[in-house]
Structures are given as C-alpha cells and as structure tokens.
C-alpha cells in the first residue's frame, strides 16, 4: 500500500514539474534573422510634456530653484531625461491644447488664462520658445499639437509660420523680434488631440473633424511642405463608443493628407489582479492590428505620390489608475502616480509590442515626462527615477535596427473578463504567454527583450539561433525587485536596472533562466 502511495505521489510531483513554467520544460525562444518584421523607428522612444499639474512648472521648469540653470530648467531633470535617450517630445497637450492659443505664450508680455482642461490658472510663462530651449538642451526633437478644438485653421498655420519660416511674413518676423533669428524647424505636427472624446473642448464628430483637419493641413503644408502631420485617431473605448468607425472615417477622409494616425491607451490594475494587468498590453497590440487593417484597406485608393503609407503613432500610453479620481485629476498636483514593479513590467511589454509591430508603429510617446504619470518625479530639493523609467531607458539605448519575428513556446494562462482601465471596454485574453518577447538585430548585434509574467516562478529557456551562431559574451540587464508592489522614492531606488554577469555564449543555442516578475534584456552577436 505504501509503495502504491509513493508511486502516485511521485507521479503527481512529476506532472506538476512537467507543466510548471518555473522549470521551463517547454520554454523555447527561436531567433531567425531572415524573419524580419520591419525597421524600428527611433521615434517609438518618445515622450510627452503637457501643461498639467507639475509637469512643466515645478517639473522641467523651476526658475529660482538652486537646482535650475540660468534659463530656469531643472538640471537634475534634464540629466534624467538624457538617460532616456528620448527621440522626440510631444507638446503642449493633451486635453490642454484644445483651449491653448500659442500667441499667449510667446514674447515679453504673457497672457494669464483660465486653464479649462485641468482646472487651474495658466500663466503662459512657459511657451513655444522655452519648450524649444528645453528640447535642444536635452538633445531631442519637438512634436507640436495644434488646437483643433477652440482654435482655428488660421491659428495653426500661423504657428507653423512662426516656428518654421526663416523670414519675410509677419509671424516669422515676430519670432525674430522675440530674440530667435533662426526658425526652429519643427517637423511633426498633430491635428488636434482626442477629438472624438466628449470631454474634449471643441469636440467634433468624425466628419466635421476631418473637414477641419483637412483644411488645417492644407494651410500648414502650404506654409512648410516638409512637415509631417498626425491625425487624431480614437481615444474613446467606452462601451457605447465605436472607435474603429472613427478611425475608419479619419483614415478614409485624410488618407491623402496625413502621415500618421494617433492612438492612445492607459491601463491599470484597480482590482489588484496581477495576471489580468500583465495582459493589458495585448489589447494595444490587437488595436494596432485592427488599425493597420483599416490603413491597408484605404491605402489601395490613396493618392500619396512617393510618400509612404499612413503609420500609427501611439502618442499617449502609460499605466494610469491610482491618480484618476476627480480630486486627483485637478490642480497643482494632478495625476501624480507612484509606480511599482508590475507597472514597469507592463511598460516593457508595451515597448515589446511597438518593436513587434515595427512595420506600422513608427512613433510612441510615454505620457508624461515629469511628475504627471511620469518616469521622473521631483520635489523642490531633488528627484528620483520611478520604476517605469528603467525599461524605457533600456529599450531606447539598446533596441534598434530590424525587428525580428521571434518564435516563442512557453506555458500560457487565461485572464478573467476585466476592464483594462477607466473608460475602457471589457476584455478577456486567452493563451497569454508567460514569456513576452521581442528581438532586434543591427550590424550582427542581437538584442532579445523578455518579460517573465509569472509572479512566482523563474522560467528556464532554451534560446536557439536558426541562422548563424551566437558569438562572444552576452551582456545582460535586468529590471526586477523583491516584490511586484515595490516602489521607488526619494533616496530609495528599490527597482532599477541591474547589470548581471556576462554570459559566455558560442554556438547555436544557450540556456537562460528568466527570474519571476522580471524584465531582461540580452545583448550579443550573431556570426
């Protein structure tokens, strides 16, 4: 009898081992450099600055603070921003832009206004030229949004003239009078923000938005033919909305006019369900594929000359749910979200998704840069890097070149039915892989990015090279911590990038154990 019991006990243990991702019996990643997805655009490593809370005032701009330079910019913030290797920064909004009039924020006399999007007073001490000084100091590029809400198409045209025309017309000369003899040469301009949202000042239906956007685009391009234009795609995924219909209309009507369509997503974990939360980036990827299908359909009849097809710009994305009450969305300290490890893993998955969809996702902007749902957090005496800073920095500094179509075999799980965020529809995700993977190659240098979604188990994985051989040491960077709820704070960097010992690799395969609840970046060569 005891013998039989022991037999059954060992059989049970073996069955658990055989299916457990912690022991990784079937975890495989295959890298084939012939299976390419598209060129990775550096603009997926963008960010966003809006006049909201302490993002601008008390964030990037803090005149009189001992930590600020002669122009009022926080030196510690600029150094942290440089570490993110930001490709471009979107400005000035966001909801803010739909009641923003750029002339209020240039020249020696600034106009103080009621700021209606986020319920505060806007002094306009910081405007176009201050922002351009900031991006030049940080070493990045600007991306401006024009006011398609309360603004006019003429106002949009005049802003392009002010920024991009060297001399001659009134607004170019006005810029010179303001002390800036050379044009700023701003390449990227979006035609409004979230215009399908009922919360947007000057909200329009799709047909009326397209009429206004088309005429604004006409005037803006006549002023500077070299600019790139981004249309406002849907941001309204509430149960009674039809975001795909909005996107279909915008792409159909503006298919000959714009270069990108902008999409937004914010996710959260209000129900404290780790596995549901870690599946939310799959929704972004599914929406990407639906929108790509709409683009492909309408590009068949487009007249674009030698311009490429419309691309997707995820120009707002982040985790945002704690600071989303009416009280926490208004005033000086609005949207001050404090992030933990599980949030950082979701950000890494978003970035994996952008890389996997490199053929169509050519821009992405984390919202926002400082204090407001941001990777950088300040007070008057210092700053710290939030958990979400580290995966973004790793991707921006290491992942470039050509995206590869990676084969992944590992255990999976199913989610419950859940809301991915406030104002979102419900989803159920099936067969969610515990390993979320992307890979890129540039000049024979391979980068493999892996999130282990498993909360408790490390996953032992065989990594195979289908063409060529892995060669030389692999550098390994890991973002992890003692607990999925671990956070950073002033003087407490509990979650950060850890450089692990190099892995000596030679041949067609190697094995790596991905720790539980971790993001790992491996970087080596293929010969």
Segment roles from a protein language model:
Residues 8-19:
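Bacterial N-terminal signal peptides
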């Amino acid at each position: 009898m005891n013998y039989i019991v022991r037999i059954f006990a060992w059989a049970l243990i073996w069955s658990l081992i055989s299916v457990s991702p912690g022991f990784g019996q079937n975890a495989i990643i295959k890298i084939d450099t012939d299976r390419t997805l598209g060129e990775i655009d550096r603009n997926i490593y963008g960010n966003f600055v809006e006049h909201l809370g302490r993002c601008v005032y008390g964030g990037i701009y803090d005149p009189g603070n001992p930590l600020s330079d002669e122009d009022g910019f926080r030196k510690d913030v600029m150094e942290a921003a440089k570490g993110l290797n930001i490709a471009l920064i979107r400005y000035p909004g966001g909801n803010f832009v739909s009641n923003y009039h750029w002339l209020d924020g240039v020249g020696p006399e600034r106009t103080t206004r009621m700021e209606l999007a986020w319920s505060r007073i806007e002094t306009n001490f910081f405007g176009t030229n201050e922002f351009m000084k900031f991006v030049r100091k940080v070493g990045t590029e600007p991306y401006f949004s024009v006011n398609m809400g309360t603004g006019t198409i003429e106002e949009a045209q005049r802003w392009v003239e002010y920024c991009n025309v060297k001399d001659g017309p009134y607004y170019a000369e006005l810029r010179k009078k303001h002390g800036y003899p050379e044009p700023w040469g701003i390449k990227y301009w979006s035609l409004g923000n979230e215009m399908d949202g009922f919360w947007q000042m000057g909200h329009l239906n799709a047909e009326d938005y397209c009429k206004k956007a088309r005429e604004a685009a006409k005037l803006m391009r006549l002023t500077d033919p070299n600019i790139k234009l981004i249309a406002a795609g849907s941001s309204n995924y509430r149960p009674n909305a039809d975001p795909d219909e909005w996107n279909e209309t915008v792409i159909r009507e503006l298919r000959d006019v714009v270069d990108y369509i902008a999409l937004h997503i914010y996710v959260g974990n209000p129900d404290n369900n780790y596995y549901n939360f870690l599946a939310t980036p799959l929704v972004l990827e599914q929406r990407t594929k639906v929108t790509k299908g709409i683009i492909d359909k309408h590009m068949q009849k487009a007249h674009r000359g030698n311009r490429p097809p419309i691309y997707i710009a995820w120009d707002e994305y982040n985790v945002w749910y704690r600071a989303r009450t009416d009280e926490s969305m208004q005033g000086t300290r609005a949207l001050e979200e404090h992030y933990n490890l599980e949030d950082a893993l979701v950000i890494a998955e978003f970035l994996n998704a952008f890389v996997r969809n490199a053929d169509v996702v050519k821009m992405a902007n984390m919202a926002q840069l400082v204090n407001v749902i941001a990777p950088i957090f300040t007070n008057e005496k210092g700053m710290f890097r939030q958990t979400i800073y580290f995966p973004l920095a790793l991707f921006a500094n290491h992942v470039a070149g050509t995206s590869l179509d990676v084969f992944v075999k590992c255990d999976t799980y199913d989610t419950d039915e859940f809301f991915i965020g406030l104002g979102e529809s419900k989803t159920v995700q099936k067969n969610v892989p515990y390993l979320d993977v992307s890979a890129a190659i540039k000049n024979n240098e391979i980068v493999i990015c892996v999130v282990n979604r498993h909360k408790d188990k490390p996953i032992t994985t065989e990594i195979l090279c289908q063409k060529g051989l892995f060669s030389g040491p692999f550098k390994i960077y890991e973002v992890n911590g003692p607990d999925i709820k671990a956070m950073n704070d002033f003087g407490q960097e509990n979650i950060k990038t850890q450089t692990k010992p190099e892995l000596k690799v030679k041949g067609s395969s190697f094995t790596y154990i991905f720790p539980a609840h971790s993001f790992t970046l491996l970087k080596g060569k293929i010969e």
